[in-house]
Amino acid sequence: MRDEIRQQPAALERTLRQEIKNVEKLKKRLEKNPPRMIVLAARGTSDNAALFGRYLLEIATGIPVSLAAPSIFTLYGASLRCQDALFVAISQSGESTDTNLVLERAKEQGALTIGITNEAESSLAKLAEHAFLVRAGREKSVAATKTYTGQMLMAYLLAYALGAKIKLDDLK
């Protein structure tokens, strides 16, 4: 675990350097059609990163942010009106069944969808309209370190794409 903690700065730099073009592309799309609300879906450690993202996004953008309750979709089969909403699924592996289902249902209901994952070939990366990779490499420790801080960095980049006054140079 100590090695993975020490690898975080390089993983964050790699994520920032390789994902910035994708973030700029999303920023242009959002400038034309900004969301009225944001919904974050995640489980486990990723859910903790989503909670951080909620505070950051609401404070930095003024857009209301909610944390998804996947059982609304998985257990109760409810359909939500998702037009003009941005749904963001966060998953280290990209294979969290209920997180992916939330994104799939939101997409069916007209939401713009984003996936944040460490796995380029994951179901989440393929399902989301915009997939952002936390380029942390393989995480051997049970306690997610590199992927967790990478997900937090992606929350900053999402805030930037939504028009927050964040200077990318400050993230380097």
Spans of features found by a protein language model:
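Glycine-rich phosphate-binding loops that contact phosphosugars or nucleotide phosphates
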Residues: N22, E31-D170
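An N-terminal, well-structured beta->alpha segment
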Residues: M1-R36
